[in-house]
Amino acid sequence: MRWNNITDIAIALEEKYPDADNINLRFTDLRTWILGLDGFDGKPDGCNEKILEAIQAAWIDERD
């Protein structure tokens, strides 16, 4: 997975952190969690706020 795999990242986050408050989540924590996902091989500096917002929104949708 890389930063542009928004849906795949959201699914992986939901599987790994099913009880996390994904609405009130700091982007620094979200970035750290994504970098720690199995199968994630994106560059640590390869994201920005827009990408993190998209991942967070997809994660919220995935949970609903």
For the regions a language model picked out, list residue spans one by one.
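A charge-rich, low-complexity, intrinsically flexible signal that marks solvent-exposed coils, linkers
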Residues: 1-64
